[in-house]
Each structure stands twice: as C-alpha cells, then as structure tokens.
Curated annotation (Swiss-Prot):
Mn(2+) binds at D15, H197, H199. Substrate binds at R14, D15, S168, H197, Y288. NCBIfam families: 4OH_2_O_val_ald, PRK08195.1. Gene3D superfamilies: 1.10.8.60, Aldolase class I (3.20.20.70). The active site is at H18. Disulfide bonds: none annotated. This is 4-hydroxy-2-oxovalerate aldolase 2. The keyword Zinc does not apply. GO terms for biological process: catabolic process; L-leucine biosynthetic process. PANTHER family: 2-ISOPROPYLMALATE SYNTHASE 1, CHLOROPLASTIC-RELATED, HOMOCITRATE SYNTHASE-RELATED. It catalyses: (S)-4-hydroxy-2-oxopentanoate = acetaldehyde + pyruvate. Its EC number is 4.1.3.39.
Amino acid sequence: MSGPNIYLQDVTLRDGMHAIRHRVDPERVGAIVAALDKAGVRAIEVTHGDGLAGSSLTYGPGSHTNWEWIEAAVTNASQATITTLLLPGVGTIAELRRAHAMGVGSVRVATHCTEADVAAQHIAAARELGMDVSGFLMMSHMAEPAELAAQAKLMESYGAHCVYVTDSGGRLTTDRVRERVRAYRDVLRPDTQIGIHAHENLSLSVANSFAAVEEGAYRVDASLAGQGAGAGNCPIEPFVAVALLLGWDLDCDLLALEDAAEDLVRPLQDRPVRVDRETLTLGFAGVYSSFLRHAEIAAETYGVDARSILIEAGRRKLVGGQEDMLVDIALAIQPK
C-alpha cells in the first residue's frame, strides 16, 4: 500500500443520530460498533446527535441516555477508540469526565465556526484528562479561509490535537474545501492534525473528503450508508473503495463495511438518507443539516413547503441551536 496514511473516524452513531431522530436501542449501537471495530475503523463517535447532554426539546429527545449508548459502544470495541462530541453550553465538563471514566478516549469540542473561544475550557479539561482532543468548527462555509484558519489556530492554542473543517451545511464545493485546508496548514503547527467532516447535500462528500486529504488532512469522518444529518455524511463504503483503488494505506475490510451498512444501518432509517429536493436545498441554501427533520415537521404542521423554510433559514443565516426559529419561519410564510 502507498499514498497518505489517514485516520478514518465513523460518525454513524453520532451525526447519524439526526437521521433517526436520536432513536436507537443500545443493543443495535453495540452491534454497529462491533462491526466497525472488526472492519478496522480506527475511531467511532457515539452520542446524541448534538453531543453530551444534547437530548432536549430543542434538539430532540433521545430514546436512551448517552450513558446507555456509550456503555454499549465501549463494551463492543476491542481496537477502535470510542469518541464523543461536546458542544460548550450544552454539554459540561462534568459530563465529559463521566464519559472519560466510562472508557471514551477522544472528544470533539464543537463550536460555530467563528466562536472557537468558547471551547477553551473544555479543550483544556479534556487534555487534563489525557484525552485525544479535536476542535470542530461547524458551518465552516460561513467563514472565509483566513478567518476560519484563525479560529483553528485558537483551538490549537487551547490544546486541540486536531482541528476540523466541518461542512455542517454540505455547502462547500471542492475548491472551497481545498482553500480552507490549505489555510489551516499555513497557520497550524506541523504536528497539529487537520480533519474533514463532509455532508452529502450537494453530492460532494466523497470528492470533498479526498480533496481535503490531498491538501494535507489526516482525519476523515465517514458513516455507514452515509448515515447522517441532511443527505448524510461521507459514505464510508465508497470512500474506502476509492481509497483502496488508489492504493492508500487504509486497513479496512470493505465487504464487512458494506454488510454493516445494509444489514444494520439502512433498516433504521424511517426517512431515506439521500440527496432529494429537501436535502439538496440544505446544501444550496447553506443550512445546518440537522435542521432537516425539524423543518419537515414544521412544514407538515403549518402546511408549507419545507424547502421554503430552509431557504429562509439560509437567508437568515441560522446556526445550530436555533431550531425553534424554523417554526417562526413556518408561521411567517403560512398561507393566510
């Protein structure tokens, strides 16, 4: 094998929670983790879609607690690192400590792309615990490359081992991904890793992930069957297939990943995870991908087109945590 040595992280059981409204049995979590672990995936993120303490009326209640899901994951992982997500202001350092005590070895601390400063305490606390820590700059399309890189530099200064270009809206085209990764590489230390988190809303997630790696990204997020918010994340099966065709240093069992996607993940979907008129609108309008299910509920409740809600959300530049505003938009555009 040749080519770049990359760190593949699965997000089926975190970002993918949005696609199934955060509803899955711990037993299925354990089965998915076991399959990913056996297939050679290096890290597996597990939590409510909005991270530790994310279960709420705003984001959507989970069918089980994060602790039940994490316990199932840790129990079934023999090689992979179990990872979790923390949004400052939602999850707390106390919850991070509990997750670490349960066996979680890595955390991504997520902020809006221009608000890295709110992550300082949480990144520092994770480092004190001895955890692997990544900064997760969400909605990365909303900041120009230089501004985004300056925010990445802040996360590095707080102690992040890695900082992600996080395309939460699936809005970035391939050239814009390249620009942001290059901007990171220009300002970050050589030993600070770069990650890419892509969404499929414009059908670019695989291409964008490869482009990021070509520009120097090391960590790549992907998910079984593309399970994730909106049209989903970078689907792990075609990503691995192309990487293997290119001779990249990626020790994953493609057939096992295909089986896990078809047998364990697709049956969970009550709404297909795919590019369609609503999810394409997310990418076109630059809207947070996890708004999809909330917008569809508001559209059905108030008799409006979900796309109209999403387009207006994009015009208003809504960000994560403003899900309640989707109802306001639906009421405003409701036929009188």
